[in-house]
Amino acid sequence: MISPNRQGIVVWLTSLKYARQLRRFGHVQYVSKKMKYVVFYCDQSKVPELVDKLSSFHFVTDVKPSMRPFINTEYEGAKPDKAKEYDYKLGI
């Protein structure tokens, strides 16, 4: 079962042969062969400890947690575009 409070972590590696080792820390979502990074998800409560732990590995060059859970996605007072509103009324 997927936890509702999960957060993404991006880990840049020196070599992709270590990408499989990251599976024990969370759910690996994407591995970039060209840019040598791994995107995986884990519980939001474990993120600070995982960032410290992953940074200590010799094969990790950089670790960045995702800020998406902290960004407000509900916009108040957004003005609709008049041209699109007119097109919707015409049925285009």
Curated annotation (Swiss-Prot):
Keywords associated with the record: Cytoplasm
One family from Pfam that matches here is DUF2129
Q: Which domain of life is it from?
A: Bacteria
Q: Say where the protein is mainly found.
A: cytoplasm
One GO cellular component this record assigns the protein to is: cytoplasm
Q: Where found in the cell?
A: Cytoplasm
Xref: NCBIfam families: PRK02886.1
Cite the HAMAP family for this sequence: UPF0298
Indicate the family of this protein.
Belongs to the UPF0298 family.
Name assigned to this protein: UPF0298 protein ABC2380
